[in-house]
Amino acid sequence: MASTAAPPAALVARRAASASVAAPLRGAGLAAGCQPARSLAFAAGADPRLAVHVASRCRAASAARGTRAVATMAKKSVGDLTAADLEGKRVLVRADLNVPLDDNQNITDDTRIRAAIPTIKYLLSNGAKVILTSHLGRPKGVTPKFSLAPLVPRLSELLGIEVKKAEDVIGPEVEKLVADLANGAVLLLENVRFYKEEEKNDPEFAKKLASLADLFVNDAFGTAHRAHASTEGVTKFLKPSVAGFLLQKELDYLDGAVSNPKRPFAAIVGGSKVSSKIGVIESLLEKCDILLLGGGMIFTFYKAQGLSVGSSLVEEDKLELATSLLAKAKAKGVSLLLPSDVIIADKFAPDANSQTVPASAIPDGWMGLDIGPDSVKTFNDALDTTQTIIWNGPMGVFEFDKFAVGTESIAKKLAELSKKGVTTIIGGGDSVAAVEKVGVADVMSHISTGGGASLELLEGKELPGVVALDEGVMTRSVTV
């Protein structure tokens, strides 16, 4: 069977079909609500080296966990502001309007523009004057092809008003346009990255930008992990500085729901390299009950356990790390599932020959590019036991249709579970492209708009653009 290659693919754990595996699990202190033995263990026939570091039980739902209070510091949101706070006020809104354009400057995907609309409409409905700022691409100075001009028609259409555009970001001409702005009107500034001072977080530039407004709303989650002038710098000069609806939703799901999830809580982590997901895996091991690993990173885990991986992608300098992560999962009682079968290819190409083999039987000269059907079944069985799922990273080289089955199967499973009330969070990046490709994006509980910002938040890092905002009300929730 011909197949295509891409970064080595994900692997999934084999279904527990044997009483010899299941029996010990029943006495492992599993909590009510976990349905572990049948789906969370390796089959007795699986290579023992695949199972050696895997804890096949749901974590901490036993009496050992008990009741836990979780405190989170919320940020003040635009929804906390009333008409009395907003009417007649100049509001600087940092949005993420970094949309793709074709060679004719036509927008090819307006998702980020649509995501910014609720915050803008709320401000307009409360009589504010909105000054909208964003970046587009990575310009080196003023670069016409990175102008925000092509965004004006779509913004105007979605808002139902004529959006005006400035030819600059700061300066006398911009100040005049702001002064002439009526209540309920929108002015779009030019690409803020036309100024090198933006990414340097230059205080003087931030001060000039802030001087245009009375208060600040950050709704650009995709750049919240950067301390730039328009995300962090302006907060030193504008109060209040609050989160927009999109940014708040990202925090609610990627921080709130992940830190204090409905359990059992499963995390699916894919991607080509362990090195790019170390922080995410380590952070999620502190929080999740089940961790499913896929993508090319899996082969580093396999080689660390002494398995032959053929020509699959391996990070030789991360073998010890892979072993330690497996040991950490076992120590914390996290059910870490590895694929039991893999779809392999004889080259990294769409027209490659392919076949399905056990994860322990990858021949020389072949590379893994997707998880196999047994692995998909095992992953799906595990996900059936959960109440919260977060997914970051594809299961295989889904850019090639032949190796997209594993990734698309996971997307469809999450859509099915989301309809049943399971909280499903798509943590940015290629996972978003996957659910959009399958046509199930609208069904998910939350789809993150951030790439690097999503990863850093999942890693437990503080995001400068969020830290700089005004603090909201301390919330406290309890899980049992």
Swiss-Prot record:
Organelle targeting sequence: 1-72
EC number, as in UniProt: 2.7.2.3
Protein localization: Plastid, Chloroplast
InterPro entries: Phosphoglycerate_kinase, Phosphoglycerate_kinase_CS, Phosphoglycerate_kinase_N, Phosphoglycerate_kinase_sf
Residues that hold ATP according to the record: K277, G296, G368, E399, D430, S431
Keywords annotated in UniProt: ATP-binding, Calvin cycle, Chloroplast, Kinase, Magnesium, Metal-binding, Nucleotide-binding, Plastid, Transferase, Transit peptide
Cofactor annotation: Mg(2+)
Matching PROSITE patterns: PGLYCERATE_KINASE
GO cellular component terms given for this protein: chloroplast; cytosol
Stored SUPFAM superfamilies: Phosphoglycerate kinase (SSF53748)
Catalyzed reactions per annotation: (2R)-3-phosphoglycerate + ATP = (2R)-3-phospho-glyceroyl phosphate + ADP
Record keyword Transferase present: yes
One GO biological process term: glycolytic process
GO molecular function: ADP binding; ATP binding; metal ion binding; phosphoglycerate kinase activity
Similarity section: Belongs to the phosphoglycerate kinase family.
Subunit structure of this chain's protein: Monomer.
Annotated protein name in UniProt: Phosphoglycerate kinase, chloroplastic
